[in-house]
């Protein structure tokens, strides 16, 4: 099959924003890139929030951006998938939950919901706990919540607010009670410090911990003792001197964290029959144990939101056509044009070549060398383009993002100037060879280096990113309202190659 060679050039951190003192892109001018956009026309793509499968209002990032580009669809992250299920009222019918509820009803036990109680959105979200409690209540199951306090992805003493919110919610909806509380330092260790987990285990299964009459009082007592959320020692809610929420034989447990790394060890303690890292004492014979996402396939547990297969990616479609493709970047972004663009696949596809150029190691921060390795990446790219016989090449240029993260505006301007010079060389070579140049970004950064108060902003922006297609003798018209997941179908459409069945994105070109 003979198709026009196409280079997808991802200018990492290149967003669109009004000119201003914090916009390194407009301060630099980037005349060569600006000229291409004027000549070829362009559109802007959403690259944050729900547009890339993140929760609404969350900024995009390089990992998510490249996955969406490579997948040719919106790749919903775990938290967003759960949010959508809650919004649609689908959580209560999830098989992992209905199976657990049924098993607990059969034994006459209770369901214990355990996990990180906050709205940090890194490991869990309090809204998910509330929805789970309602689902269990509606299924006729008694609910006990075991709250692991955050203080790391949230303020150090914000935990009492989350406990108040949940306790009030459970009481007003008659949907259960909070039975115990402990800091994530103990319940969510991931570094094999099993002594910490064993303290949380003793609280959960034996009711060991400082007693309290109510959960809010338990947190306030911890604060009075000088403990902050992350480090709150086990606290148990008691009535008549006895813990109200101990996990017993015949009960069921649902671990509601959606991030796996800090939920894995405690889960092993409940289900691993060969546990050898300390004395657990009596291990409850549970009616069931289920988790929000897959923490470890070896556990063999029911999972509410298992990993989504991402077949039919851009790289796979190209490989299935028997075509050669190139991935190239410097170290800082190499994983993004390989592993993440291939949606979690480590090994190259047949016909996929990879070129890694080392990022500078002679500086501590890239504001001291804003050129990074862009010139070496460009040199190698053009050598490969001239002689490699590739139908698709994907190149990431890292400067605008990595220098943007330093917040040093003069350095970011220099990074933009460097990238602009590389774009000129790349465009000249691609067009002279009769190829096609697709230019875009994964998220913004360098265009917004000051916040509304004029203070340095080093995080990614929420801005849209430009998208254009440049080729000799043809000017395209682009639609509005696109997302990163539309890029792969656009490239395939230009070749006349059908998008894969899994690609839900649509072409950005109208004519």
From Swiss-Prot:
Q: Record's CDD domains?
A: iPGM
**Which Pfam families does the annotation name?**
iPGM_N, Metalloenzyme
The catalysed reaction is: (2R)-2-phosphoglycerate = (2R)-3-phosphoglycerate
- Family matches, as InterPro entries: Alkaline_phosphatase_core_sf, BPG-indep_PGM_N, Metalloenzyme, PGAM_B_sf, Pgm_bpd_ind
The residues annotated as the active site are 62
Q: In which pathway does it act?
A: Carbohydrate degradation; glycolysis; pyruvate from D-glyceraldehyde 3-phosphate: step 3/5
**UniProt cofactor(s):** Mn(2+)
User: Where, by residue number, does Mn(2+) 2 bind?
Assistant: 12, 62, 442-443
Cofactor remark from the record: Binds 2 manganese ions per subunit.
Per the UniProt entry, what are the Gene Ontology biological process annotations, in alphabetical order? glucose catabolic process; glycolytic process
Chain sites annotated for binding Mn(2+) 1: 401, 405, 460
Q: How the protein assembles, per its UniProt entry?
A: Monomer.
Q: What does this protein do?
A: Catalyzes the interconversion of 2-phosphoglycerate and 3-phosphoglycerate.
Q: Which family does it belong to?
A: Belongs to the BPG-independent phosphoglycerate mutase family.
Q: What name has this protein been given in UniProt?
A: 2,3-bisphosphoglycerate-independent phosphoglycerate mutase
Provide the species name. Answer: Nitratidesulfovibrio vulgaris (strain ATCC 29579 / DSM 644 / CCUG 34227 / NCIMB 8303 / VKM B-1760 / Hildenborough)
State the gene name recorded for this protein: gpmI
């Amino acid at each position: 099959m003979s198709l026009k060679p196409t280079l997808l050039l991802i200018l990492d951190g290149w967003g669109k924003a009004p000119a201003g003192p914090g916009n390194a892109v407009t301060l630099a001018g980037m005349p060569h890139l600006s000229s291409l956009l004027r000549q070829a026309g362009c559109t802007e793509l959403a690259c944050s929030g729900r547009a890339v499968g993140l929760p609404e209002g969350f900024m995009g990032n390089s990992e998510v951006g490249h996955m969406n580009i490579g997948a040719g669809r919106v790749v919903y992250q775990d938290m967003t998938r759960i949010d959508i299920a809650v919004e649609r009222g689908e959580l209560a019918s999830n098989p992992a939950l209905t199976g657990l509820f049924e098993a607990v009803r059969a034994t006459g036990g209770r369901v214990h919901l355990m996990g990180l109680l906050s709205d940090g959105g890194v490991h869990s979200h309090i809204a998910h706990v509330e929805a789970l409690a309602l689902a269990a209540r509606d299924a006729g199951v008694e609910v006990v919540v075991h709250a692991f306090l955050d203080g790391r992805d949230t303020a150090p003493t914000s935990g009492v607010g989350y406990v108040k919110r949940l306790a009030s919610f459970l009481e007003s909806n008659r949907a259960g009670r909070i039975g115990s509380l402990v800091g994530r330092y103990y319940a969510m260790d991931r570094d094999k410090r099993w002594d910490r987990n064993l303290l949380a285990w003793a609280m959960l299964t034996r009711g060991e911990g400082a007693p309290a009459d109510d959960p809010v009082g338990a947190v306030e007592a911890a604060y009075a003792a000088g403990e902050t959320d992350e480090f709150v020692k086990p606290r148990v809610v008691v009535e008549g001197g006895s813990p109200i929420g101990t996990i017993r034989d015949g009960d069921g447990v649902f671990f509601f964290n959606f991030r796996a790394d800090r939920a894995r060890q405690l889960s092993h303690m409940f289900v691993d029959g060969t546990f050898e890292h300390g004395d657990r004492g009596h291990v409850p014979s549970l009616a069931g144990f289920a988790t929000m996402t897959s923490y470890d396939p070896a556990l063999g547990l029911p999972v509410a939101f298992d990993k989504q297969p991402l077949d039919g990616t851009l790289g796979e479609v190209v490989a299935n056509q028997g075509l050669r493709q190139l991935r190239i970047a410097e170290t800082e972004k190499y994983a993004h044009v390989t592993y993440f663009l291939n949606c979690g696949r480590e090994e190259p596809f047949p016909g996929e070549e990879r070129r890694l150029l080392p990022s500078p190691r002679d500086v501590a921060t890239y504001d001291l060398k804003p050129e990074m390795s862009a010139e070496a990446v460009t040199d190698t790219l053009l050598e490969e383009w001239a002689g490699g016989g590739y139908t698709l090449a994907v190149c990431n240029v890292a400067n605008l993002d990595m220098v943007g993260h330093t917040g040093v505006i003069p350095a970011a301007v220099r990074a933009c100037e460097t990238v602009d010079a590389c774009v000129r060389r790349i465009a000249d070579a691609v067009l002279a060879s009769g190829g096609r140049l697709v230019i875009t970004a994964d998220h913004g950064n360098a265009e917004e280096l000051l916040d509304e108060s004029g203070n340095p902003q080093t995080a990614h922006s929420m801005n849209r990113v430009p998208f254009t297609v440049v080729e000799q003798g043809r000017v395209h018209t682009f639609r509005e309202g696109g997302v990163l997941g539309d890029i792969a179908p656009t490239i395939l459409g230009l070749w006349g190659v059908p998008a894969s069945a899994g690609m839900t994105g649509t072409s950005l070109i109208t004519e």
